Amino acid sequence: MEGNGQDMYVAGEERFGFFTSHGYSLSRIIPTFRRFYTFVINDITNQKFSRIMDIGSGNGYVLAQVISQNSNATGYGIDPSPYMVRIGSRRARRMGISARVTFMMGSSHEIPTKGKFDIIYSTMSFHHWSNREKAVTDIMQLLDDNGKFMIYEASPRGGFNRKLVKAHLMDREDFILLSKKTGVPIAEIVENGGFIRATFVNR
């Protein structure tokens, strides 16, 4: 389902409108972002899954790449921006994977699909979310047994990252504190070249 022009952001979240949504595709010309996307895509494709969701899927680049490399998987991308949803849907059609990938309006506080997932993930989106603690506990309910919620962010380590606004960075201590607040244990934290991935598993 493509967006109808109404966004689903809540107060305090960074909004992506028409121009910023289309301009975001240019981020891949920046070497640091290319390395980040490569890290995420390689990391996810090395996991076992048949049903996967991207929360804050943006222009759909990561999810489309992941699904194109796993012919047995279906993917769902949700984003609060109708413009991002349209861009992701067009990308899936161009790549010939629209039968296995669905982009729709949604957000961390309003997930519009039913059923369980093997993996739910977010990429450089989690730091935008309002009420992260509630979002994490809600997301864990959508995972199959041993399903994973994987959060990918930029960390303060690395020269480029230190130039970013601090609010856009997350480190190991942020995720440890999140685990304590939610009571959801962290299965793994991986740091790689200025990027970080925290994994929560539904035991």
Predicted segments, located by residue:
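Class I SAM-dependent methyltransferase Rossmann-like catalytic core
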Residues: 18-32
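A conserved beta-strand element that flanks and buttresses the S-adenosyl-L-methionine
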Residues: 121
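Class I SAM-dependent methyltransferase SAM/SAH-binding core
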Residues: 53-55, 59-108
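C-terminal alpha-helical "lid/dimerization" subdomain adjacent to the S-adenosyl-L-methionine
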Residues: 27, 150-199
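Conserved alpha-helix/loop element of class I SAM-dependent methyltransferases that forms part
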Residues: 31-48
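Short conserved loop adjoining the S-adenosyl-L-methionine
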Residues: 110-114
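N-terminal, positively charged/glycine-rich alpha-helical extensions of SAM-dependent methyltransferases
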Residues: 1-21
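A short glycine-rich, Lys/Arg-flanked "PGG" loop and its adjoining helix->strand segment in the class I
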Residues: 134-145
